[in-house]
UniProtKB/Swiss-Prot annotation:
This is Dynein regulatory complex protein 1. Belongs to the DRC1 family. GO terms for cellular component: axonemal dynein complex; axoneme; motile cilium. Residues 1-25, 49-72, 451-476 are annotated as: Disordered. It is found in: Cytoplasm, Cytoskeleton, Cilium axoneme; Cytoplasm, Cytoskeleton, Flagellum axoneme. Component of the nexin-dynein regulatory complex (N-DRC) a key regulator of ciliary/flagellar motility which maintains the alignment and integrity of the distal axoneme and regulates microtubule sliding in motile axonemes. Plays a critical role in the assembly of N-DRC and also stabilizes the assembly of multiple inner dynein arms and radial spokes. Coassembles with CCDC65/DRC2 to form a central scaffold needed for assembly of the N-DRC and its attachment to the outer doublet microtubules. It comes from Xenopus laevis. Residues 92-419 form a coiled coil. One of its GO terms (biological process) is regulation of cilium movement. Keywords: Cell projection, Cilium, Coiled coil, Cytoplasm, Cytoskeleton, Flagellum. The keyword NADP does not apply. Component of the nexin-dynein regulatory complex (N-DRC).
């Protein structure tokens, strides 16, 4: 075995081992082996004795041993700290897994409940429809009234079941909202605990690192003193060799100095000639610059005289300004007296206006009470009118359906019996309708859906317009998505007082967009903004609130060339604009009732509905009916003439029968035998073929 291999084995035994279970120790052992191999090659190349290296490597360095011990202790401390911190994450993951399992079970139960309710509702509806079909043939008003009441009670029961299901789902939704807030709070507490443990681990690590660093520094200091003692001897030997080499280099330097002096003499001669040439050139340049200096002095004298004149003019103007300032001070004194008088008048007018305001407030309250009473009466009359309208509609609709059914039966008889054609029933989808037609309200997105779409658009240069269609006779509005996003961000930043402090603390760890959406939800709830149209109203109002003062400024004076005619609202004006919006545009909102639907219904659909009933039988069938009517009239005339002919034929047959009877009696009479030439013989001779 070579000396290098023995040294490698000894260093492996003394330091980190390649067979260690710790990966860091194996890496460190490989590094030490590579360093030892390189050092051995270097010493072998320099001719040093490897026995000295063997003596040095027999014992491991104290610094390496202390460093390895410190590394192991610190690694164990870091692993323990990481395990302590990850315990929180593991507990959170387990809790989230449990919550998801419970959520799946609740979702399954809710789906089963909805399916059962849908089946029961469908069975009730089929029972109501079947009962209506069976009782439709009854024409007694009293029985019809009882049947209608029964059907109405069953429909009310069905609607009540639906409302109960909706109420249960809303309660479940509120419970989920509360659970969501609690989960957010729990997550915030877990994060605080996690941060606290991490800070504690950081403090412990810093403290331990400092202690280990002090120990390592002490060991290195001890090794340093030992190395200084060993290197000092080597240094003295090297200094002696250095003195000898310096003496040799000094002798060679003296020789080079003599050579350099000769070269310097030659360079001085060359530089002297170049200096004379440059001196002549520079003297010429100096003369040219002196001429330019004289010209500059003349220009300076002229400018000085101009400045003296301007100074005298400014001094005269300063005296005039002093006189004007004294006059303005006297004018300010007079205006101060006028201001005091105006303040007294203002105080009187404020008092008077307060009294008038109180009187107007009393009148306003009285008018509001009258308005509420009038509104109550209007709702009552609207309900009565709606009920009457519905009753008349149902009566006319029933009569219309009966007439249409009779016409269809007549058309079927004509097609099948008279024309012998296959009868195809027309489209009678309007016959399925019962009751007045309700106008279809336009579907609108919610305010939060619009806010989510706008906030999720990250393109800063997006100039696409968010257009809104015509609603209640208004023209469609176009507002850029960038403007809507900027206005909503201003609302989030400036309307923080509308958000609860508890919710604000919970939103702090979220991202900016998610935090803005939750803030907008609270702000929209406070302002009563529920649908897309309300959001555009708010944005347009804020834009107008910004433009109106600018338009007043344009009327009072001219704008600067670089100023913008239309800018977005400033953040300082947001609160005043929101207050004005609430006072001017916000109205109490209620649920959309059936009366409101009846008021907003489109009467054009009524015309189309009744026109569809009138056109249940197409125009082509009417032309067929007209042609059939004229043909039947002609057929009736033919049948009439045939009836007359049949009557005449019956009469002739009766006469013929009587004549045959008389003839038979005459032929069978006994008197014919007694005659020599009976009439029958003559008849047979005249008619032999008979």
């Amino acid at each position: 075995m070579s000396l290098y291999e023995r040294e490698s084995e000894e260093s492996a035994v003394a330091g980190p081992s390649l067979d260690s279970e710790d990966q860091q120790q194996r890496i460190e052992a490989r590094r030490l082996r590579i360093v030892t191999r390189i050092e051995a090659k270097r010493r072998e190349a320099l001719g040093e004795d490897l026995k000295i290296l063997k003596k040095k490597t027999e014992e491991p360095r104290k610094s390496h041993k202390q460093t390895e011990d410190s590394r192991q202790r610190l690694g164990k401390l870091v692993n323990d700290g990481s395990q302590l911190v990850t315990n929180i994450q593991i507990a959170t993951d387990a809790r989230e897994t449990q919550r998801r399992g419970e959520e799946e079970e609740l979702k399954r139960l809710r789906r089963e409940k909805l399916d059962n309710e849908a089946k029961s509702s469908l069975e009730k509806f089929e029972e109501i429809t079947k009962r209506w079909t069976l009782d439709k043939a009854k024409q007694v008003p009293q029985k019809m009234w009882e049947i209608l009441n029964t059907q109405q009670q069953q429909c009310a029961q069905l609607i009540e079941d639906k409302n109960n299901l909706i109420s249960d789902l809303q309660k479940e939704l509120r419970r989920k909202d509360d659970q969501y807030v609690k989960d957010l709070k729990k997550q915030a507490e877990d994060i605080d605990l996690l941060v606290e443990r991490m800070e504690e681990q950081i403090k412990n690590l810093i403290k331990t690192y400092r202690q280990e660093l002090l120990q390592i520094e002490k060991v290195f200091e001890l090794e340093r003193r030992e190395l200084l003692t060993a290197n000092r001897n080597t240094w003295e030997q090297g200094m002696q060799g250095r003195r000898d080499k310096e003496l040799e280099s000094l002798m060679s330097r003296m020789k080079k100095v003599e050579e350099y002096e000769n070269q310097l003499k030659q360079l001085r001669v060359q530089d002297g000639e170049e200096y004379n040439m440059i001196k002549i050139k520079l003297e010429t340049d100096v003369q040219i610059l002196q001429q330019q200096l004289q010209q500059m002095k003349a220009t300076y004298q002229l400018n000085q005289e101009k400045l003296e004149y301007n100074y005298q003019v400014l001094k005269k103007r300063d005296e005039e300004n002093t006189i004007t300032k004294s006059q303005q001070k006297r004018k300010i004194t007079r205006l101060q007296d006028v201001l005091n008088n105006l303040r007294l008048k203002q105080a009187k007018q404020v008092k008077q206006y307060k009294e008038e305001n109180q009187s107007l407030m009393d009148d306003y309250k009285r008018i509001v009470e009258q308005y509420k009473e009038l509104q109550k009466k209007m709702r009552h009359f609207s309900a009565v009118d709606a009920k009457m309208f519905q009753d008349i509609w149902l009566m006319n609709e029933e009569e219309m359906k009966q007439l249409v059914q009779k016409a269809l039966e007549a058309d079927q008889v004509i097609q099948e019996q008279q024309l012998g054609m296959c009868w195809e029933p027309p489209d009678l989808c309007f016959m399925d309708n019962v009751g007045p037609l309700l106008g279809k309200l336009k579907d609108q997105k919610s305010a939060m859906s619009l806010a989510q779409e706008v906030m999720s658009s990250h393109a800063p240069g997006d100039q696409s317009s968010a257009s809104e269609g015509e609603t209640d006779g208004r023209q469609c509005r176009e507002v850029s998505a960038e403007t809507v996003k900027h206005i909503l961000e201003l609302l989030c930043d400036e309307s923080g007082f509308l958000i609860e402090n508890k919710l604000t603390r919970l939103l702090s760890p979220l991202e900016r967009d998610e935090r803005s959406l939750i803030k907008l939800d609270s702000i929209f709830g406070a302002l009563g903004v529920t649908v897309e149209e309300d959001v555009y109203k708010l944005v347009e109002f804020l834009c107008r609130y910004k433009r109106e003062p600018e338009e007043e400024g344009d009327a009072g004076g001219s704008l600067e060339p670089g100023s913008k005619a239309h800018g977005l609202i400033h953040s300082n004006d947001v609160l005043r604009a929101v207050k004005a919006f609430v006072m001017d545009f916000q109205k109490p909102r209620g649920k959309v009732s059936r009366l409101r639907l009846m008021e907003e219904r489109d009467s054009r659909e009524d015309t189309e509905y009744w026109a569809a009933a009138a056109k249940a039988i197409p125009e082509s069938r009417f032309r067929v009916w007209d042609a059939l009517e004229s043909a039947l009239e002609k057929y009736y005339d033919v049948l009439g003439s045939r009836g007359q002919l049949i009557t005449e034929t019956v009469s002739l047959r009766q006469q013929n029968t009587e004549l045959r009877t008389l003839l038979h009696q005459y032929l069978n009479s006994k008197i014919n035998v007694e005659l020599e030439i009976p009439p029958t013989q003559m008849m047979q001779g005249e008619y032999p073929h008979t």
